[in-house]
Swiss-Prot record:
Disruption phenotype: Cells lacking this gene do not grow on erythritol as sole carbon source, in contrast to wild-type.
Keywords: Carbohydrate metabolism, Isomerase
Active site, UniProt feature: 65 (proton acceptor)
Top-level EC class: isomerase
Family the entry assigns: Belongs to the LacAB/RpiB family.
Origin species: Brucella abortus (strain 2308)
InterPro entries associated with the record: RpiB_LacA_LacB, RpiB_LacA_LacB_sf, SPI_LacAB/RpiB
Name of the featured protein: D-erythrulose-4-phosphate isomerase
Main function: Catalyzes the isomerization of D-erythrulose-4P to D-erythrose-4P. Involved in the degradation pathway of erythritol, that allows B.abortus to grow on this compound as the sole carbon source.
Pathway this chain belongs to: Carbohydrate metabolism; erythritol degradation
GO molecular-function terms, A-Z: intramolecular oxidoreductase activity, interconverting aldoses and ketoses
């Protein structure tokens, strides 16, 4: 599985810890905030990573900022992306299993590195069942997305 890990100025330290933690099991790419350009605002970083997930460059991604909220909002602006703010393993699992989230976000000022590692592991261990009972909900999310994102 190809996984992108990125953090803004507040999240880059935790993003590095997560990337190092995952490298033995996944094909991990660390995206630095300076790679995103445009003064490295978290919105630009989120856009770059979410767009790369959408085009298939990465299968999943983890975005980190101070709270996880800003990168989550920004990633969800990319049509077709489902990003979820996760600060516990149950939410990370459900993000993948119930919502087919491609991206999780977290706050470096909210959780510590060891908890963040368990959250990343929980998210990446799950696979969405396209024929499962949550598929209808995800299809409905996609329909709402298409309704408002007519490009």
């Amino acid at each position: 599985m190809k996984v992108a890990v990125a953090g803004d100025s507040a999240g880059e330290g935790l993003a590095k810890v997560l990337a190092d933690h995952l490298k033995d099991r996944f094909e991990v790419s660390e995206i630095s905030r300076t790679d995103a350009g445009a003064d490295a605002f978290y919105a630009n970083l989120s856009d770059r990573v979410a767009s790369a997930v959408l085009d298939g460059t990465y299968d999943r991604a983890i975005l980190v900022c101070g709270t996880g909220i800003g990168v989550c909002i920004a990633a969800n602006k990319v049509p077709g992306i489902r990003a979820a703010l996760t600060h516990d393993t149950y939410s990370a699992e459900r993000a993948a299993l119930s919502n087919n989230a491609q991206i999780i976000t977290m706050g470096a000022r909210v959780i510590g590195a060891e908890v963040a590692k368990t959250i990343a592991d929980a998210f990446l261990a799950q696979t969405f069942d396209e024929n499962g009972r949550s598929a209808g909900n995800v299809n409905a999310i996609n329909e709402v997305d298409a309704k408002y994102n007519k490009f």
